[in-house]
Amino acid sequence: MWTGQNIAYDYDAAHNSADLSIISLEAILNNGMKTTCGGFANFYSALCHSQGIYCLYLKGGSSSEGYSRAQLAEAPANHTWNAVALDGQWYYVDCTWISDLGVENGIVSGGENIKPFYALFGFGEMSIEHRIDRSEHICYGG
């Protein structure tokens, strides 16, 4: 939940097609701890890797843009989040959705409404609002 409490969602970057210059670890740390969902998932993957936790970077559709559960199957890939393996079980983590902390037009807002539900949730819960299209294991350093 640290990421959701300390990294802000960059609405300006999201409106302007965020790329690697926004979601890389260096960009997050050097640009005022703000990013888009890709950066949240990238940062969380790095944290897990540093602790020896197997973590996947997931990309797919989500209900974040107003898609209903029925529409989710056909929705474009519009979101990234993570899956972690803990004690032989898979759990899902959506750091973007954990907090409402955001930056738009240089103004920081939110941060009061932490949603721990998105910290370690199961496949059934995940599949209500997320659709996995692709998964990657990203390795950081040696």
What label would you give each PLM region?
Residues 29-40, 74:
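Extracytoplasmic/periplasmic, Sec-exported soluble proteins
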Residues 123-137:
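Ligand-recognition surfaces built from glycine- and aromatic
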Residues 42-126:
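Hydrophobic/aromatic-rich core segments of domains that either
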Residues 17, 21, 66, 100, ...:
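Residue-level signal for alpha-helical context at structural boundaries
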Residues 11, 17, 95, 106, ...:
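Short linear motifs in intrinsically disordered/low-complexity regions
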Residues 1-32, 45:
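Secondary-structure boundary elements
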